[in-house]
C-alpha cells in the first residue's frame, strides 16, 4: 500500500506532467484564463487519464507485448497508434457525455475538448506507464495521479492569471509573455519536490 501511495504522490508533485515534463502546454496556456474552465478541463483530463493509462496497460500487456497473443510475435511497434486510438475513443465518449449532460462546460471547453485526444500529457502518461513497466494496479494509481497533476497545474495557473488581470503588468509582457514567466516560476516551485525520495 505504501508503494502505491508514494507512486501517487510522486506522480502529482515530483513528476508533474505540466510543470516537470512540460507536456500539454498548448491547452495548458490556452484554457488557463478562467478557473472554472480550467477546472472543467482538468477534471476531463483526470477522467481520460485515469481510464486511458490502465486501458492501455491492458492493451499492451495482453495484445502488444512480446508473446502476448502468439508465441514469438512482438506487436510493440504498433504501440503509438494503438494508444492514440484508445485515447481518441475515450475522448469521444467523454465529449458525448459532456454535450448531453453538461452543455455549459462542453461549450466553454470548445475546441480544446477534442484536442485532449492529441494532448501530449495524456499520451505522455501512457508512454511513461509502458516505459516504466507498471502493472495494472500501478497504472491505475499513476493514471489518476498524473491526471490530477496536470489538473492541479492548470487550475493554479488559471487562479494566478485571474489575479494578474488586476496587476500592473508591463505592456510588453501582457498576455502570453507573463504567462510563460509564471509557468517557469511555477515549474521552479515544483522542481523543489524533485529532491524528495519516496
Curated annotation (Swiss-Prot):
Membrane-topology descriptor: Multi-pass membrane protein
Pfam families from the UniProt entry: Rnf-Nqr
Protein's name according to its UniProt entry: Na(+)-translocating NADH-quinone reductase subunit E
Family membership: Belongs to the NqrDE/RnfAE family.
PANTHER family reported for this sequence: INTEGRAL MEMBRANE PROTEIN OF SOXR-REDUCING COMPLEX, NA(+)-TRANSLOCATING NADH-QUINONE REDUCTASE SUBUNIT E
CC terms in the record's Gene Ontology section: Gram-negative-bacterium-type cell wall; plasma membrane
Compartments reported by the entry: Cell inner membrane
